[in-house]
């Protein structure tokens, strides 16, 4: 026999602490929790092997290729402070292992079978460094932040949205009516809920028609460009494309997709169509918590966010920060920057393990939504800045006077915060006062403030930065 048969020690081949990473390598940071008795080098090497060229035993066909050229390498291991049995393994993958322009293929390798590997108790992908050479094979977001602002003719402030509730059960006409009321009141966007697809009580085509009517009517009334995220997510790619095509025929500005449940292949297909046809693409992250919520296993949302920027989307939901823990604020702002900026420096305090250069791939607007209302507006304006979409579902529709006054309240609060910021006032310290002053000339805002006043507004902690 021309080769040595038998089960292999991974670390002989796949643990290479002297390796100098290449600019073209995809780099991954894994949080590894090995089974008791498995040394870190062996576990790290096993991760590199199982997510690249390795198999559990030496095979005859290894001799027909150059392992050195194609293998993943565990090139560095560092302990996790405060965790005895955990460490971070850094793995470098040669670029040739991945199909160009395919997030699907990248994930199949890097977060594929290796996550079920027996020698590990748990495995979490914390971050990826996408090399510029690979970034350039992706189209990325259909339009990006600047083009979106130009299309909408809205500058110098965050955009306002609202998810239409109750999310399931309204007829198409009543749904369109709710959309119209919100847009007329001063919102920029309304949104299909992520689970509104095409159910018996409201088929997609009827909803699209009535929402388009609401958009045109509110545009004529307000003189502003309006949009409604029409959810094109469907059971098959063909149905999804049918919905996107119909949206384009109606002349609406934006459609929506659930990128994790719909899948990366479908998402990239839709993103390409959106760029070719001038549609903005709003992305919802339903199912993300199944993947990213466990600290020890799965993958961090910043990886899903990077993958979305490659696959394509103009907006993506990114949490709210408000009312969360201080540490989470920094981590959230870390991946918000990864979505928006062109070049992001490595910064472990914000959870960013690698410097990422997006080489002019368009940026994605982060969407803050979930449990926010007018009292949060100063905090949101301060934290997210202008390039964001602030979405108030219940915070609009829960207004005691109805949808349009709810929209007015949010718009007045936003404009007051932006104006105060531009005048140099400190939103962190004066947030409550700014909202209270604005109440004097907006009865709608005063009513909203009254409804949600007992909900605490904790925002002092910013001063510690």
From Swiss-Prot:
InterPro entries: RuBisCO, RuBisCo_large_chain_AS, RuBisCO_lsu_C, RuBisCO_lsu_C_sf, RuBisCO_lsu_fd_N, RuBisCO_lsu_N_sf, RuBisCO_lsuI. It catalyses: 2 (2R)-3-phosphoglycerate + 2 H(+) = D-ribulose 1,5-bisphosphate + CO2 + H2O; D-ribulose 1,5-bisphosphate + O2 = 2-phosphoglycolate + (2R)-3-phosphoglycerate + 2 H(+). GO terms for cellular component: chloroplast. Its EC number is 4.1.1.39. GO terms for biological process: photorespiration; reductive pentose-phosphate cycle. PROSITE patterns: RUBISCO_LARGE (PS00157). The modification N6-carboxylysine is found at residue 191. Mg(2+) binds at residues 191, 193-194. Signal peptide: none annotated. Its main location: plastid. It is found in: Plastid, Chloroplast. The active site is at 165 (proton acceptor), 284 (proton acceptor). Keywords: Calvin cycle, Carbon dioxide fixation, Chloroplast, Disulfide bond, Lyase, Magnesium, Metal-binding, Methylation, Monooxygenase, Oxidoreductase, Photorespiration, Photosynthesis, Plastid. The disulfide bond which can form in the large chain dimeric partners within the hexadecamer appears to be associated with oxidative stress and protein turnover. The modification N6,N6,N6-trimethyllysine is found at residue 4. The record marks 324 as: Transition state stabilizer. SUPFAM superfamilies: RuBisCo, C-terminal domain (SSF51649), RuBisCO, large subunit, small (N-terminal) domain (SSF54966). NCBIfam families: PRK04208.1. Belongs to the RuBisCO large chain family. Type I subfamily. PANTHER family: RIBULOSE BISPHOSPHATE CARBOXYLASE, RIBULOSE BISPHOSPHATE CARBOXYLASE LARGE CHAIN. The basic functional RuBisCO is composed of a large chain homodimer in a 'head-to-tail' conformation. In form I RuBisCO this homodimer is arranged in a barrel-like tetramer with the small subunits forming a tetrameric 'cap' on each end of the 'barrel'. This is Ribulose bisphosphate carboxylase large chain. It comes from Fragaria ananassa. The lineage of its organism: Eukaryota, Viridiplantae, Streptophyta, Embryophyta, Tracheophyta. The gene is rbcL.
């Amino acid at each position: 026999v021309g080769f040595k048969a038998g089960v292999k020690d991974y670390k002989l081949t796949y643990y290479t602490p002297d390796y100098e990473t290449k600019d073209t390598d995809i780099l991954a940071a894994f949080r590894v929790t090995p089974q008791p008795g498995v040394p870190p080098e062996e576990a790290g090497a096993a991760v590199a092997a199982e997510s690249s060229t390795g198999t559990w035993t030496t095979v005859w066909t290894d001799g027909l290729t150059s392992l050195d050229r194609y293998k993943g390498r565990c090139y560095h291991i560092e302990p996790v402070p405060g965790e005895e049995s955990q460490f971070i393994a850094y793995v470098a993958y040669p670029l040739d292992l991945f199909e160009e322009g395919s997030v699907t293929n990248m994930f199949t390798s890097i977060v594929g079978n290796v996550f079920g590997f027996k020698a590990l108790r748990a495995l979490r992908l914390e971050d990826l460094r996408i090399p510029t050479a690979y970034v350039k094979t992706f189209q990325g977001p259909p339009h990006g932040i600047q083009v979106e602002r130009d299309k909408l003719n809205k500058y110098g402030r965050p955009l306002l949205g609202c998810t239409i509730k109750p999310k399931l059960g309204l007829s198409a006409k009543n749904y369109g009516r709710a959309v119209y009321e919100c847009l007329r009141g001063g919102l920029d966007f309304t949104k299909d809920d992520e689970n509104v697809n095409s159910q018996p009580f409201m088929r997609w085509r009827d909803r699209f028609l009535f929402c388009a009517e609401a958009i045109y009517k509110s545009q004529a009334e307000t003189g502003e460009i309006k949009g409604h995220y029409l959810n094109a997510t469907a059971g098959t790619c063909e149905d999804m494309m049918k919905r996107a095509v119909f949206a384009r025929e109606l002349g609406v500005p934006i459609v929506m997709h659930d990128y994790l449940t719909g899948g990366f292949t479908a998402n990239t297909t839709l993103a390409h169509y959106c760029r070719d046809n001038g549609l903005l693409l709003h992305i919802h992250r339903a199912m993300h918590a199944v993947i990213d919520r466990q600290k020890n296993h799965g993958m961090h949302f910043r990886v899903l966010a990077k993958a979305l920027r490659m696959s394509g989307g103009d907006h993506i939901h990114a949490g709210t920060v408000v009312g969360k823990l201080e540490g989470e604020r920094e981590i959230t702002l870390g991946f918000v920057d990864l979505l928006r900026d062109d070049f992001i420096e490595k910064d472990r305090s914000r959870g960013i393990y690698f410097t990422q250069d997006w080489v002019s791939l368009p940026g994605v607007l982060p969407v803050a939504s979930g449990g926010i209302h007018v009292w949060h507006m100063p905090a949101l304006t301060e934290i997210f800045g202008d390039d964001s979409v602030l979405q108030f579902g219940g915070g609009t529709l829960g207004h005691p006077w109805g949808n349009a006054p709810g929209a007015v309240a949010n718009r007045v609060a936003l404009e007051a915060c932006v104006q105060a910021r531009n005048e140099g006032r400190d939103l962190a310290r004066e947030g409550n006062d700014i909202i209270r002053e604005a109440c004097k000339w907006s009865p709608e805002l005063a009513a909203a403030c009254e409804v949600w006043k007992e909900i605490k507004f904790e925002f002092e902690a910013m001063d510690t930065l």
